[in-house]
Amino acid sequence: MKIGIIGAGAAGLTAAYDLLNSGHQVIVYEAAPFIAGQASTIPVGGFPLERGYHHLFTNDTAILDLMDELGVGDKMQWYPSNVGTHTEGTTYKTTTPVDLLRFGALPLKDRIKLGLFALKVKRIKDWRTLESQTADFWLRERLGGAAYEKVWAPLLKGKFGDHYDEIGMPWFWSKIQTRFASRRGLRRREMLGYPDGSFDTIFETLHNKIISAGGQVHLSQSVVKIETSDGQATGLTSETQSGEKVFEAFDCVLSTTPSFVFSHLVDLPDDYRKRLDDVHYLGAVVLILEMSQPLTSYYWMNIADADVPFLGLIEHTNMLPKEWYGGNSILYLTNYLDRTDPVYQMSQDELLEYYLPHLTKFNPEFDRSWIKNVHYNALSAAQPIIGTNYSDHIPDFRTPIKRLYLANTTQIYPEDRGTNYSVRMGREMADMIAADQKNSWKYWN
């Protein structure tokens, strides 16, 4: 069987790898000039660094198993996380449960309440019982008070903006499950994974395995149309860098594009198209600062302060060696935004000027002379907004067009989007496609 895959991110490459190992022909098309999507890298100080911050959790079994299979499992290293929370102009250490008891932004009873509440959520086994509630409503009703208003409410608003009160409670539940599962030791300190050589270690190896198995990966080649005949996918028309349109026939097609991209590539029935269009995506803007010294002592900073105009402050080299990056400290400043938001529209220089005055809130001694270099990245489909009762509305992997499949971050549920889940989904798609062929495509008959 000859299979066309749109997108060379984690899901597309993993599906291609498995399908090739099952004896199929595979061609992958990628609009960007690089592989790995949101896990792709740029050179910083002579070493690859992800365009957006990346790490793994100890329960990210899909990608860890893939690394073992690729022969690079020994490259994964585990580091203790170091977490701060910035609220009302002050930064507090919140790495361990003991730190939470010392969290001076809350009265003692609310600190205890906050910790016990997280344990309560962790013990919920069936996320389906939460589907009818938004995270905002559920947390207000069951946590409430200062513990909600000073911690979770600002974090929800920071991440989802005006959409904070639309997010289904299963999203919050899955976050709690992941964070607890990655804690080790008596002090329950979170351990985070990062591969030696960056995430390139995983995806360059995966890419090389695909090529060695006879697969093809066409970079800088956008698919402009999914061709169909009598309700069945028959091939792809792509556009090369030179503007040439190229048609390639396929027995089936897997698209890993965002829903709003996919819906423009092929005519779809109204009900399925509505499922795609009903999910709103937030974009993201990321600044990476190469600095002569660290801004804080933390790897991860939760920002629960409406006066700070960015959502995340991640100091990569507070967990990983700065020697990898020419001795500089690496700081990510990240934000999720509607694509119509004026901040999303800002240039690199405008965004830097907008953010800089706020860095002294985290370190009064900060001076812009610390900044040696700046990198900018924008993503149009960084975070889907998943609302209540989403299992009733999630788009099927098998589209109404015969032999045409869709797999993207709107279909990772109840978990939030993430590299591990994209790998898992890619493997599931390869299994599904192979099984459907074996069963003579009966799903569509």
Regions picked out by a protein language model, each given a short descriptive name:
Residues Q221-L331, N335-Q345, D349, Y354-F366, ...:
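Mid-domain catalytic core of redox enzymes
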Residues G45-W127, P154:
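Dinucleotide-binding Rossmann-like beta1-alpha1 core, especially the glycine-rich loop
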Residues L20-V44:
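Glycine-rich FAD pyrophosphate-binding loop
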Residues A11, F34, F260:
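Conserved Rossmann-like nucleotide-cofactor binding loop
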Residues G387-N445:
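C-terminal lid/capping helical subdomain adjacent to the catalytic/cofactor pocket in oxidative enzymes
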Residues Q77, Q216-H218, K372-H375, Y405:
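General small-molecule cofactor/ligand-binding pocket signal
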Residues L116-S229, T240, A249:
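Active-site/ligand-binding neighborhood in enzyme catalytic cores
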Residues K2-V28:
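N-terminal Rossmann-like FAD-binding beta1-loop-alpha1 element of flavoenzymes
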